[in-house]
């Protein structure tokens, strides 16, 4: 990590341009890790298509239908599955989640970056379907103790369901090398800078290196520090045991 390095925000001319297909950035991680807050800060002011997932779970206090999720009945969701209308879909803690395909393909084709915030199982489906086009970013908790505190603080889950989420989080953390990037969300400002760097670096790599600006090179340098390959199995085990 290089918390002192400043990276310019992605240029709107590179994040929404018809000359290149847009980036497909998939943000995933354990429930309670802070994906929503991080995503809002990262994407503020950007012309990025944020895909709103469908779900069959009940809305939490403050969540808005069509903004945070599209809340549907199981019957409506399963009909969409039968129509092959999801890029990915998964069942998590008894509820269905899915990402509709058509709006994503349309945004990518017009050169607009697309961001998905989805469950890990769904992220792996996107990786299988889209290959290297999908830029997978795993958001890591600083520790399991901190993740437990965040989940408990929600006051929306039973103790049994929290334990299920924590066990799943352990498994997901140990599989972090399946993702291209891993960002530890222990400092919101730093995590936002790292996401901005990843986005700019991936755009830079679509062009010859001779065309890179100084800001592009700084972004590539910072993005390399959050590659999943930087983490050892021992690093992941320490977080799981913490």
Curated annotation (Swiss-Prot):
Pfam family name, one: Guanylate_kin
Q: Name one GO molecular function term.
A: ATP binding
Which family, according to the similarity comment? Belongs to the guanylate kinase family.
Known function: Essential for recycling GMP and indirectly, cGMP.
* InterPro entries cross-referenced by the UniProt entry: GK/Ca_channel_bsu (IPR008145), Guanylate_kin-like_dom (IPR008144), Guanylate_kinase (IPR017665), Guanylate_kinase_CS (IPR020590), P-loop_NTPase (IPR027417)
Residues annotated as domain Guanylate kinase-like: 22-200
Question: Which key words tag this protein in UniProt?
Answer: ATP-binding, Cytoplasm, Kinase, Nucleotide-binding, Transferase
Family matches, as SUPFAM superfamilies? P-loop containing nucleoside triphosphate hydrolases
Binding-site residues for ATP, renumbered to this chain: 29-36
**Lineage top rank: taxon:** Bacteria
Q: Where in the cell is it found?
A: Cytoplasm
Give me the reactions it catalyses.
GMP + ATP = GDP + ADP
GO cellular-component term (any): cytosol
Recorded E.C. number(s)? 2.7.4.8
Please name the Gene3D superfamilies in this protein's record.
Guanylate Kinase phosphate binding domain, P-loop containing nucleotide triphosphate hydrolases
Q: What is this protein called?
A: Guanylate kinase
């Amino acid at each position: 990590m290089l918390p002192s390095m400043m990276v310019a925000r992605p240029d709107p001319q590179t994040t929404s341009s018809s000359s290149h297909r847009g980036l497909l950035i998939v943000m995933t991680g354990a429930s309670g890790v802070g994906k929503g807050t991080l995503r809002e800060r990262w994407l503020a002011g950007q012309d990025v298509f944020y895909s709103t997932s469908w779900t069959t779970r009940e809305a939490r206090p403050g969540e808005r239908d069509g903004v945070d999720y599209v809340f549907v009945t199981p019957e409506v969701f399963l009909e969409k599955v039968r129509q092959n209308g999801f890029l990915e879909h998964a069942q998590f803690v008894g509820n269905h989640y899915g990402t509709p395909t058509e709006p994503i393909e349309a945004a990518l084709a017009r050169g607009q970056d697309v961001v998905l915030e989805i469950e890990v199982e769904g992220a792996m489906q996107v990786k299988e379907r889209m290959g290297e086009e999908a830029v997978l970013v795993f958001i890591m908790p600083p520790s399991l103790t901190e993740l437990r505190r965040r989940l408990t603080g929600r006051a929306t889950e039973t103790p049994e369901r929290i334990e299920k989420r924590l066990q799943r989080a352990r498994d997901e953390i140990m599989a972090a090398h399946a993702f291209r990037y891993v960002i530890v969300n222990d400092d919101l400002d730093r995590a936002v800078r790292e996401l901005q760097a990843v986005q700019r670096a991936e755009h830079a790599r679509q062009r010859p290196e001779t065309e890179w600006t100084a800001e592009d090179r700084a972004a590539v340098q910072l993005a390399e520090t959050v590659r999943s390959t930087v983490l050892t199995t021992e690093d992941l085990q320490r977080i799981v045991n913490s």
